[in-house]
UniProtKB/Swiss-Prot annotation:
It comes from Salmonella typhimurium (strain LT2 / SGSC1412 / ATCC 700720). Homohexamer. The keyword S-adenosyl-L-methionine does not apply. Its EC number is 4.1.2.53. SUPFAM superfamilies: Phosphoenolpyruvate/pyruvate domain. HAMAP family: KDR_aldolase (MF_01290). GO terms for molecular function: 2-keto-3-deoxy-L-rhamnonate aldolase activity; aldehyde-lyase activity; magnesium ion binding. Pfam families: HpcH_HpaI (PF03328). Its cofactor is Mg(2+). This is 2-keto-3-deoxy-L-rhamnonate aldolase. Mg(2+) binds at E153, D179. NCBIfam families: PRK10128.1. It catalyses: 2-dehydro-3-deoxy-L-rhamnonate = (S)-lactaldehyde + pyruvate. The gene is rhmA. Belongs to the HpcH/HpaI aldolase family. KDR aldolase subfamily.
Amino acid sequence: MNALLSNPFKEGLRKGDTQIGLWLSSTTSYMAEIAATSGYDWLLIDGEHAPNTVQDLYHQLQAIAPYASQPVIRPIEGSKALIKQVLDIGAQTLLIPMVDTAEQARQVVSATRYPPLGQRGVGASVARAARWGRIDNYMAQANESLCLLVQVESKVALENLDAILEVEGIDGVFIGPADLSASLGYPDNAGHPEVQRIIEACIYRIRAAGKAAGFLAVDPAMAQKCLAWGANFVAVGVDTMLYTEALDSRLAMFKSVQSVSTAKRSY
């Protein structure tokens, strides 16, 4: 099978395109496919805070595959063993949470690359990623098409941001607003002026270093701010939150209920 691997999401980042995404926390392939038909540039399948197994992630990758939306998987953490599994099921773009140091970033880069560039285990003949051994020269293609994003979401990570940005193999840095605001002493308040100032400065530093800058904003006004500041891959909602808002809004048409505004909620 003489197929060439491609990663449109990574190519978009290279070109500087702005890519609008959606967070998938519902854990179902059915909801993932519905989202894929909406036209978002990318869909984040969340394995950190949503109760997804590796097989759940696999089924959602399958559901998204026929459509133009590009899947991004966030595993629960950046261990070498888990990264190997997620790559083998066909993920080409990963978002690794809680990366605090350049050394952590280098370890993640190594876990995602086949030797001699890294330490990813070899098992292409039994992996969906290689179409069970049918993609010629898969290992070299996989190293090239992989897109690796890391999350900066703590005071320690902020202190080490410049060093993280220097790590070869990191394609983009994502600012985690909920954990970051808590780490800075403003829990559940990513809208605090000091947090906002830091987010804007981080986005500028990331882009100045030649990397892509990402963000999740459940408030549309905050999403627009981040885009104006230079973030070029921004998730503008979470499927489960949008679902609860729609349910509450519909019920409010017929019963007296209190609905929670998106602008007052954080992820």
